[in-house]
């Protein structure tokens, strides 16, 4: 299992809230047969499963604390091991949020093949999030909160991008255009991995 994981294609997908990275991940899954893993989704699924780990996570999250890195990595690894035989590769969405997380991931799971940086400007992301807020009813889609989320995102992400740029595995996609425009750039990068 360990060996298989190490040989898998692993793509970190990084992009701000409203950059459209979720949509791009869905399209990658359809076209390339990759498995899309979002740490947020994994955490939510674990909590609603009512498992012992889920109960522990629920308590941590209710206090507004960060889930321990160890736990997040264990969950990612379990999810990857479960799919390693059938998946063409893995999209790790919203991770790593800091350099240390990336280093730990490599120690425990494997090296990323590529970091796909879905890059949209702050105005575009704000506009998209406000639009989503009209229909989603998500409490975190209002202008004040969005500003804070973007600041947090930039602060956390810049060192991560710089870290992987040194290795030459960052592929930046301009996410200002339409979904299809962005996806054609994504495909250009992914097609080189065959």
UniProtKB/Swiss-Prot annotation:
Region of interest called NMP, as start-end residue ranges on this chain: 38-67
InterPro entries, per database record: Adenylat/UMP-CMP_kin, Adenylat_kinase_CS, AK1, AK1/5, P-loop_NTPase
Gene3D superfamilies: P-loop containing nucleotide triphosphate hydrolases
pH-activity note: Optimum pH is 10.0 for ThTP synthesis.
Enzyme nomenclature, EC number: 2.7.4.3, 2.7.4.4, 2.7.4.6
Quaternary context: Monomer.
Name by which UniProt lists this protein: Adenylate kinase isoenzyme 1
The organism of origin for this protein: Sus scrofa
Gene: AK1
């Amino acid at each position: 299992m360990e060996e298989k994981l190490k040989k898998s294609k692993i793509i970190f997908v990084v992009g701000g809230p409203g950059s459209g990275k979720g949509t791009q991940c869905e399209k990658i899954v359809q076209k390339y047969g990759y498995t899309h893993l979002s740490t947020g989704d994994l955490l939510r699924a674990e909590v609603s499963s009512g498992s012992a780990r889920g109960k522990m996570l629920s308590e941590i999250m209710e206090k507004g604390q960060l889930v321990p890195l160890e736990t997040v990595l264990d969950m990612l690894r379990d999810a990857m091991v479960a799919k390693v035989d059938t998946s063409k590769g893995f999209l790790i969405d919203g991770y790593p949020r800091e350099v240390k997380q990336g280093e730990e991931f490599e120690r425990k799971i494997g090296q990323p093949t590529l970091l796909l940086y879905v890059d949209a400007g702050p105005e575009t992301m704000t506009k998209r999030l406000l639009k989503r807020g009209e229909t989603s009813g998500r409490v975190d889609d209002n202008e004040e909160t969005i500003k804070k989320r973007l600041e947090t995102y930039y602060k956390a992400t810049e060192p991560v991008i710089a870290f992987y740029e040194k290795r030459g595995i960052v592929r930046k996609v301009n996410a200002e255009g339409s979904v299809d425009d962005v996806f054609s750039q994504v495909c250009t990068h992914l097609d080189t991995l065959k």
